Amino acid sequence: MSSSNNTVVYWGTGRRKTSVARVRLVPGNGTITINGRPGDNYLNYNPAYLAAVKAPLQTLGLSTEYDVLVNVRGGGLTGQADAIKQGAARALCELSVDNRKPLKTEGHLSRDPRAKERRKYGLKKARKAPQFSKR
């Protein structure tokens, strides 16, 4: 939590795959801004991505009370949307300790450990082997 010009700002960081999102919650009317662009525009108006970003706020019924300002880097839209979700959930935990239990129950605070598996030598991809010839 930090305050600038007597406005309380809550910070949270979220990660998914190679995406890292730094999320700020500022008292407002519920607008979402991602990298300086409107949230729905940035996420290509995809309802699944928008729902993921709004999920932590809707869980607590605060979707119209805070503006979400996001700086996100790396990865694609799926990873970025989930990173924003986790960052927003962590910022809401900073807001009040009572918010932690419902957010944890819904799974918004969990870091998804799945990431791209590394390529191994002798193989074409992580697990795809070259065609086998018996003779």
Swiss-Prot record:
Q: Which InterPro entries match?
A: Ribosomal_Su5_D2-typ_SF, Ribosomal_uS9, Ribosomal_uS9_bac/plastid, Ribosomal_uS9_CS, Ribsml_uS5_D2-typ_fold_subgr
Biased composition annotated in UniProt, kind: Basic and acidic residues: 102-115
Q: Which Gene3D superfamilies does UniProt cross-reference here?
A: 3.30.230.10
Q: Which Pfam families match?
A: Ribosomal_S9
Q: Which PROSITE patterns match?
A: RIBOSOMAL_S9
What GO molecular functions are on record for this protein? RNA binding; structural constituent of ribosome
Spell out the residue ranges making up region: Disordered: 102-135
UniProt keyword list: Ribonucleoprotein, Ribosomal protein
Has UniProt tagged this entry with the keyword Ribosomal protein? yes
- Keyword presence, Ribonucleoprotein: yes
User: PANTHER family from the xrefs?
Assistant: RIBOSOMAL PROTEIN S9, SMALL RIBOSOMAL SUBUNIT PROTEIN US9M
Family indicated by similarity: Belongs to the universal ribosomal protein uS9 family.
Protein name (record): Small ribosomal subunit protein uS9
> Which organism does this record belong to?
Synechococcus sp. (strain CC9311)
Give the source lineage, highest ranks first: Bacteria, Bacillati, Cyanobacteriota, Cyanophyceae, Synechococcales
